[in-house]
């Protein structure tokens, strides 16, 4: 288990309990279960206290936790007959975005998501979830297929933002993001999104201009990272806590503002402490969102999606 900075007291208690049990495994005559159980109760109480009222900055830390389920985990856990598509038919295949045809509850869908990777090798391969233009163009290809075959689209968002490198800019990063956002708005099929970790800037919006948007309880969704915001506004990245407060990037704030439609509860201690339960909860949320939309006419779906985003400026964010 990887512990976050604010979880250090918890790591000490759980570490002691594990040490006691390890000693008992090496010496059958030792009876440490009573002491270990007491430490377990203490750890659970502390965990509840730590997660009772997380600050926006702490939610950012939880959203970035390396042990949270990632896009690949959700696809493997919720979808069957997954057939990935590769490449943008123009430049290359971007591994930061994965997607393809699949079945969800036995019904055909198109699933698209950003994948960060779980270890050093896969994180480098996936570019830490930061897509290049070819990734967004691959997403457009998939959405075109969904539109042609009348398949609902499910997107899973988890990115710190689109890749800001020189090559990406030269190949039209801004244009690719804009085209992907435009494609979302034009789709005549149901489009639902779940923010499973970080939803960073236009790199997230390009996959999240949806009819229905859900966020995991401790995920975040913002125009910029707290560190980036602090660097621009205060010329000091260390002011990320103040920036996180000001950005109103938590699921709870965004639900109040009308930016998202649903909050998916996470297990105590975050998705990383209950990966299977989290995947199942996301599956139920996707099922409920699709039920609201499947069977609707294309014109209705397009109008619903457009009005959702147009209304943000007059009803939610402007309030």
Curated annotation (Swiss-Prot):
The keyword Lipid biosynthesis applies. Residues 38-292 form the CoA carboxyltransferase C-terminal domain. Its main location: cytoplasm. PANTHER family: ACETYL-COENZYME A CARBOXYLASE CARBOXYL TRANSFERASE SUBUNIT ALPHA, ACETYL-COENZYME A CARBOXYLASE CARBOXYL TRANSFERASE SUBUNIT ALPHA, CHLOROPLASTIC. Keywords: ATP-binding, Cytoplasm, Fatty acid biosynthesis, Fatty acid metabolism, Lipid biosynthesis, Lipid metabolism, Nucleotide-binding, Transferase. This is Acetyl-coenzyme A carboxylase carboxyl transferase subunit alpha. Pathway: Lipid metabolism; malonyl-CoA biosynthesis; malonyl-CoA from acetyl-CoA: step 1/1. GO terms for biological process: fatty acid biosynthetic process; malonyl-CoA biosynthetic process.
């Amino acid at each position: 288990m990887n512990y976050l900075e604010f979880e250090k007291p918890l790591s000490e208690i759980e570490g002691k309990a594990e040490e006691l049990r390890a000693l008992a495994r090496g010496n059958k005559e030792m009876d440490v279960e009573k002491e270990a159980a007491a430490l377990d109760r203490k750890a659970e109480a502390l965990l509840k206290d730590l997660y009772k009222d997380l600050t926006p900055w702490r939610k950012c830390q939880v959203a970035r936790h390396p042990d949270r389920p990632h896009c690949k985990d959700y696809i493997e856990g919720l979808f069957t007959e997954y057939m990935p598509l590769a490449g943008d038919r123009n430049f290359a295949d971007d591994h930061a975005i994965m997607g393809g045809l699949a079945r969800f509850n036995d019904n055909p869908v198109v699933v698209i998501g950003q994948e960060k990777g779980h270890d050093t090798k896969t994180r480098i391969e996936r570019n830490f979830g930061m897509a290049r233009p070819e990734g967004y163009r691959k997403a457009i290809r998939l959405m075109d297929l969904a539109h042609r075959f009348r398949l609902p689209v499910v997107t899973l968002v988890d990115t710190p933002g689109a890749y800001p490198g020189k090559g990406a800019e030269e190949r039209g990063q801004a244009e690719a993001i804009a085209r992907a956002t435009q494609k979302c708005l034009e789709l005549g099929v149901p489009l639902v999104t779940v923010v499973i970790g970080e939803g960073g800037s236009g790199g997230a919006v390009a996959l999240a201009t949806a009819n229905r948007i859900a966020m995991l309880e401790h995920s975040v969704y913002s125009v910029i990272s707290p560190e980036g915001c602090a660097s621009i506004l205060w010329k000091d990245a260390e002011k990320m806590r103040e920036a996180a407060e000001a950005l109103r990037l938590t699921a709870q704030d965004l639900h109040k503002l009308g930016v998202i439609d649903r909050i998916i509860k996470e297990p105590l201690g975050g998705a990383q402490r209950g990966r299977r339960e989290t995947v199942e909860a996301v599956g139920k949320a996707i099922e409920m969102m699709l039920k609201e939309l499947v069977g609707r006419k294309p014109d209705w779906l397009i109008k619903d999606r457009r009005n959702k985003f147009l209304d943000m400026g007059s009803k939610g964010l402007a309030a």
